Amino acid sequence: VTASGPTGADPSCPDAAFWCGPARVSELIESVGEDPGPGPHLWYVHATTPHIPWIYTPEGQQYLPRGLDALAIDGLGRDNAWTEDISAVRQAFQRHLLQVGAVDRLVGQLIDEMEDDGTWDDALVVLVADHGVAFSPGLPARAPSPTTNAEIYNVPLFIKAPGQVDGRIDRDN
């Protein structure tokens, strides 16, 4: 099995990895259809989106400037806990949802490209996140608690098996 994936050496992404997430997925999409040579092949990408600072629109446009100022999320303290200000927490949640929209668009582009190339039907495709985030005023965004467990541990897992036609949703986790 040979493997390939974006190298992360993109000069347009000099900052932390979260600035590069959409670019890395786009690079993977562009590689669909390239001849990997004989035998099985693994394409992979580690994309850090959606992730703080939640800076992308569903169209993939960055709406905040690069730099440390963009890392600040109103309502989220340095201790990674939310303020009691529900408006600030709701705004952060909306920013998160915008970036989820960007991820959804990229996944759709990947599927479309694989279908157009004829690789979708025979492919095993796995998409997974490593953690969620809680948007509960006054509580930590990432530290599990009885109040935040459902948000933090509710992570997406998408598996498309080779030859699979019908999908299903399984919420038993």
Regions found by a protein language model. Name each.
Residues 1-173:
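Catalytic domains that recognize anionic headgroups
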